[in-house]
Amino acid sequence: MTYMDLINEIKALGFPCTYGSFKSTPSIPFCTVNFAYNNDMIADNQNYQDVGQYQLEYYNSIKYPPDEQKIESKLKELRLPYAKVETFLDSEDLYQVIYEFQIIGG
């Protein structure tokens, strides 16, 4: 799996989704995927296996658990264990839910 595969899977759920940021803000709800850092497996003083730490960010003007459940079910289906963090962005007047996970070899 690559981050592009994930973006396509999220789009198939009906959410606008892109890497990084949109050129113009889409209608809500929408998602972005971002690379956070690498956590490669290292052996014999070299990077043995690529392990990328990514974030899937979901934005909506209301707290809407059915959308979150769709995303969580898809991440589980794709076997991407995740941690979830939620906040309200006052300046944007949006809820933000961040799913953090690793993509190995992608």
Predicted regions and their residues:
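Transition segment at domain starts
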Residues: 24-25
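Acidic carboxylate-rich catalytic motifs and surrounding loops in phosphoryl-/glycosyl-chemistry enzymes
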Residues: 21
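Charged, amphipathic alpha-helical segments and their flanking helix caps
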Residues: 1-18, 35-106
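A short, hydrophobic beta-strand-centered structural micro-motif
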Residues: 28-33
